[in-house]
From Swiss-Prot:
This is Leucine--tRNA ligase. It is found in: Cytoplasm. SUPFAM superfamilies: Anticodon-binding domain of a subclass of class I aminoacyl-tRNA synthetases (SSF47323), Nucleotidylyl transferase (SSF52374), ValRS/IleRS/LeuRS editing domain (SSF50677). PROSITE patterns: AA_TRNA_LIGASE_I. It catalyses: tRNA(Leu) + L-leucine + ATP = L-leucyl-tRNA(Leu) + AMP + diphosphate. GO terms for biological process: leucyl-tRNA aminoacylation.
Length: 882
């Protein structure tokens, strides 16, 4: 051995070639060992990986390598989420075909991922734009259609005027398209929908089973599904005020207890009664048209200014036939939630209060907080939505004053269920969900074609299974926005599979979130040409044991995947309903920003930073021009605060980048990119190499074990090794990689101390200590292998092992070594903790008392007062009473 510096540039490619040549990460589906499936969300092939990818895939790789070392048959695949608008945008901007652009990017990014040393089974690789993949997606669409899980219907949709496509509600962020940033409009189109709402209750209740998911993700899904219990309430209408003598309007409410506070009824702009009234009211028609210029997403509607139009129609209050409420058309009422109509109780709903304050309708509080005087309780600008007792809620029909909200709801429900309007009860109990069906139609080329043919005679006809896949044509033009498939001269013209007559293909393609809603199941057997899955294999390998990705996908991707898995189960493609047993959401990689004098951003590579006392000053490298150091933000191309992984790997090596990503902060929090932190990680790589290099010549052969029970130094080393092994396993099992890293820093220091204190002439002069050191250094290399695999391979070879550390099994923890002969007890004085005392585990009470009273903290707390008694709870706590 030599003490030369570790050369990552030479070492890392060499070990990567060995892994590839031996296909050691290829998973065998018939392996009898217990399986473990770890998966990071697969990337969109945008062109290059970024530091967020490095962090995400490093975390997954640590889990995969650790579980493999523990004896599991690990599935750790990789593929590409390859359809989507960016490819079409690139085609328009650069005159390149989306397919060429996509596959070129895949080649680049695959090489980058390989340079990270990830333990991926590349034999299972696919891109969602491969016809061999989307063939099966088309097959499942047809199966879902036959099972009643797909529907084609007219619908108001979110239209992105820049991307010229439809967006799901979840893809509208603050009123703008999630990719283009354009203000979204409403349009009425015929669309294909997956009937996710059919599973609303199941998707909600099953969240309780997902105990290895973050609470915040489950809460987000619960809120999005939005279960609410209430009343379907029928308001009679004054027929003298309705356009065609309509007699009633139905309202869904979760707060029937507040009916005495009602001030108006509001209709969605798309409500049939609103449409009928608009026929004879041009001003109302214009208002409705204005409402349609905003998107259909709930979040956008909630934040928009509340606007309404008094239709002149009057509704009759169900508690009093002489009490009439004005009927408005309002921009905040959604047609596809409930009935498309609401009653407004402004005192107890902020949206309604904003509305009545704008239109001068007034408000009447009907719930009073406990402890407030009902006679003086008023609401002005802030609605009261808390608990309390009913007030102002008595008449000859019903008396609610003094009731709790729950009791009042029940009383109203029973009273209105017992009376009729026409031949039906005025009210009936109903459960509603916020979740709406998933519109999957997209008016673009680069997506999975929907396998449908439209025939004037036969109607909607699925493409025969034998004719799948319906492939995208290559000869398309991107000379203007819109869907090139609509303009293609031949592709869409086909014969009807049923009657043979002239027909046309469906030119909409599927939302790209469909592609990512089942890829994890396809990874289990991507070689099956006849079916999306091989049941025996997918049911054995799924669900994914550990899924890793960003919290931004909590609703979009994760909820869609849960639905899609249920749909696959219903059509016989899988035998389970939940795709991900464990879910982990990692934090982002962030970096400070740098703004030049002209207001534009500079990249970190263009900046020099120097310390000036307590301040840091930044300037441009080329001109020396001062630069403002801005806030720390998510790495993004627009802020130019990105760091190229290739530069870091080229300068320091992949292991340094991996170690930094794992060590700097808890994995669920953002990590601040720091050049100093990277340099520190690089120093640790060299530190480990120096330790191994120095110790290797002094070690006995691999496998040497000698009894260390009567050798204090050797026994202490074995205790440290197995304690660290236990701590690292616990850290990785909890995905607390930063704590595992911290334990390794401590352990390396302990091994360095052993080397420094070795007998003169080295460890070889003490065979028992040398044997313990052999075991300890083996464990060190095994423990760093999931995190710094290239360095670990180099060290494994250096200490005399013939195989690859990536194929080595971790040793079993000797639990007897983890039992300490001492115990640390908290010490209280008069019930308040003052310190701790460490005593022998078998110490008797007099020994414990003496040790406690000798503590300076106890003496200070007693302040000369006599000790009345000492209470010792064995193995738990000591309390001194003074």
């Amino acid at each position: 051995m030599t003490n030369e510096r570790y050369n990552a540039r030479e070492s890392e490619p060499r070990w990567q070639r060995q892994w590839d040549d031996n296909a050691i990460f290829a998973t065998q589906n018939d392996d009898p060992r217990p399986k473990y499936y770890v998966l990071e969300m697969f990337p969109y092939p945008s062109g290059r990986i970024h530091m967020g990818h490095v962090r995400n895939y490093t975390m997954g790789d640590v889990v995969a390598r650790t579980m493999r070392a523990r004896g599991y048959n690990v599935l750790h695949p990789m593929g590409w989420d390859a359809f989507g608008m960016p490819a079409e945008n690139a085609a328009m901007a650069n005159k390149v075909h989306p397919k060429s652009w996509t596959y070129a990017n895949i080649a680049t990014m695959k090489a980058q991922l390989k340079s990270m040393g990830l333990s991926l089974d590349w034999s299972r690789e696919f891109a969602t734009c491969d016809p061999s993949y989307y063939k099966h997606q088309q097959r499942m669409f047809i199966d879902f259609l036959a099972a009643g899980l797909v529907e084609r219907k007219q619908s108001k949709v979110n239209w992105d005027p820049v991307d010229n496509t439809v967006l799901a509600n979840e893809q509208v962020i603050d009123g703008r398209g999630w990719r283009s940033g354009a203000l979204v409009e409403q349009r009425e189109l015929t669309q294909w929908f997956f009937k996710i709402s059919k599973y609303s209750e199941d998707l909600l209740t099953a969240l309780d089973r997902l105990d290895r998911w973050p609470d915040k993700v489950r809460i987000m899904q619960r809120n999005w599904i939005g279960r609410s219990e209430g009343l379907l309430l029928r308001f009679a209408l004054d027929t003298s005020t309705t356009p065609n003598h309509e007699t009633e309007v139905e309202v869904f409410t979760t707060r029937p207890d507040t009916l005495f506070g009602a001030k108006f009824v509001a209709l969605s702009p798309d409500h049939p009664l609103a449409a009928e009234a608009a026929k004879s009211n041009p001003a109302l028609a214009a208002f409705i048209e204005e409402c349609r210029k905003t998107g259909t997403a709930q979040a956008e509607i909630d934040t928009a200014e509340k606007q309404g139009f008094d239709t002149g129609i009057r509704a009759v209050h169900p508690f009093d036939p002489s009490w009439q409420l004005p009927v408005y058309v309002a921009n905040f009422v959604l047609m596809d939630y409930g009935t498309g109509a609401i009653f407004g109780c402004p005192a107890h709903d902020q949206r309604d209060l904003d509305f009545v304050n704008k239109y001068g309708l007034g408000n009447l509080p009907v719930v009073c907080p406990e402890g407030q005087d009902p006679a003086t309780f008023v609401v002005t600008d802030i609605a009261y939505d808390g608990d309390g007792r009913l007030i102002n809620s008595n008449n000859g029909f019903i008396a609610l004053d003094g009731m709790s909200i729950a009791d009042a709801k029940e009383a109203v429900a029973k009273r209105l269920e017992a009376i009729a309007l026409g031949n039906r009860p005025v009210a009936q109990r109903q459960v509603n969900f916020r979740l709406r069906d998933w519109g999957i139609s997209r008016q673009r080329y680069w997506g999975c074609p929907i396998p449908i043919i439209h025939c004037e005679v036969c109607g909607v006809v699925p493409v025969p299974i034998k004719d799948l896949p319906v492939k995208l044509p290559d000869d398309i033009e991107f000379d203007r926005p819109g869907n090139p498939l609509d303009r293609h001269p031949t592709w869409k013209h086909v014969a009807c599979p049923q009657c043979g007559g002239k027909a046309r293909r469906e030119t909409d393609t599927m939302d790209t979130f469909v592609d990512s809603s089942w890829y994890f199941s396809r990874f289990t057997d991507p070689w099956n040409e006849d079916a999306p899955t091989t049941r025996a294999v997918v049911d054995r390998m799924m669900p994914v044991d550990q899924y890793i990705g960003g919290v931004e996908h909590a609703i979009l991707h994760l909820l869609y995947s849960r639905f899609f898995t249920r749909a696959m189960q219903a059509t016989g493609h899988v035998g389970f309903d939940e795709p991900f047993r464990g879910m982990f959401t990692q934090g982002m990689v962030v970096h400070e920003t740098y703004r030049k004098l002209d207001g534009t951003f500079a990249s970190p590579a263009e900046i020099r930073i120097v310390a000036d006392g307590d301040n840091r000053l930044a300037s441009l490298l080329d001109s020396g021009q001062p630069v403002e150091i801005g806030p720390i933000e998510k790495m993004s191309k627009s802020k130019r605060n990105t760091v190229d992984p290739d530069d870091i790997i080229g300068s320091y090596g992949a292991d340094t980048a991996r170690w930094f990503m794992l060590s700097d902060s808890p994995p669920d929090r953002d990590v601040i990119w720091s050049e100093d932190g990277v340099k520190g990680a690089s120093r640790f790589v060299q530190r480990v190499w120096r330790l191994v290099s120095a110790m290797a010549p002094q070690l006995p052969a691999p496998g040497t074990r000698l009894d260390a029970a009567n050798h204090p130094a050797a026994q202490a080393l074995r205790v440290a090794a197995h304690r660290t092994l236990s701590e690292i396993l616990a850290g990785i099992d909890r995905l607390r990689f930063n704590t595992a890293v911290a334990k390794l820093y401590v352990y390396v220091g302990e091994l360095e101390a052993v080397l420094a204190n070795a007998p003169q002439g080295g460890l070889g002069g003490d065979p028992v200590l040398a044997a313990a050191a052999r075991e300890a250094i083996d464990i060190l290399v095994l423990l760093i292998a999931p995190m710094m695999p290239h360095l670990a391979e180099e060290c494994w070879a250096a200490i005399g092992h013939s195989g690859l550390v990536s194929e080595a099994r971790w040793p079993e923890i000797e639990t007897a070594l983890l039992v300490s002969d001492s115990i640390t007890l908290p010490v209280q004085v008069n019930g308040k903790k003052r310190g701790e005392v460490t005593v022998a585990r078998d110490a008797q009470n007099p020994q414990i008392e003496a040790a406690v009273l000798a503590l300076d903290a106890v003496k200070q707390a007693l302040d000369g007062k006599p000790v009345r008694k000492i209470i010792i709870v064995p193995q738990r706590i000591v309390n001194v009473v003074g």
